[in-house]
């Protein structure tokens, strides 16, 4: 496992992290909590140190699950979680709809105390605003300035070691402005980024390079398109979040077909590596990309993603060839990539 500095903080993280939402919710088909805890433990044993959680995942149960799996190695891992959605006054909504945000300093404190309790720890290593809009980030916004001042105070008290933002849930150009605003505060940002979805990559990573503030990326496998198992006939279980993120079965099928046509053109790059490993190597190309947070929901994926040292390295020439394919939209006239909200 490779380890990288999360620039702008004192944290060092595994280049491949673990997004606990895949095992802490039922949105990815892992309904067995014992399996979820085994995967978390196996990830640690295979060198993963960054575990990315959120208080909204199963209304806090995902944080408890992480504690149960990893409490005895707490000081050997980087505990990252998120806040901002009002899970106290607004229960989960059908169809995984967003809950209202509360960015008041008082709510942040309340959320922080609850996460500390559920995670069984005295500090959060990396505390992130969960899907904020620009008014909760930008300098000069009273809402944001008050919130970030309180985050600084919590840091001074030792309750958090570092803070940042996790942007979403939809992938759109609005997040370029949000990501840049976060970096300009000296706060790392987590974005959706993969070789099929690079809307945020170039502008956000360029600003990260200029400011020397780090970036994390989730969904490096484009919601499954780059995992190697999808076909045009793939269907998702009823609780799978991808059923909610595209409005109709026809749109979902079109999204898959569009993505799979692009994936087919990546076959020449698969000598000595799987498609899933290629996706991770590509997204880690920038030195400011501290860690990737793939969706891990079975042992096969876990082993593959934590075995990058065994895969043939991605050369600069190969990286450039893939970028050239992306620049011409893989020769296709239409694109539905980016429609899935994550």
Residue ranges of model-derived segments:
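Beta/alpha (TIM)-barrel catalytic core signal, keyed to glycine-rich beta->alpha loops juxtaposed to Asp/Glu
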Residues: 132-325, 329, 339-342
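Acidic (Asp/Glu)-rich catalytic clusters
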Residues: 8-10, 68-75, 117-120, 153-155, ...
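Short, acidic/polar
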Residues: 30-43, 104-118, 171-179
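N-terminal binding-site loop/beta-alpha segment at the start of enzyme catalytic domains
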Residues: 1-81
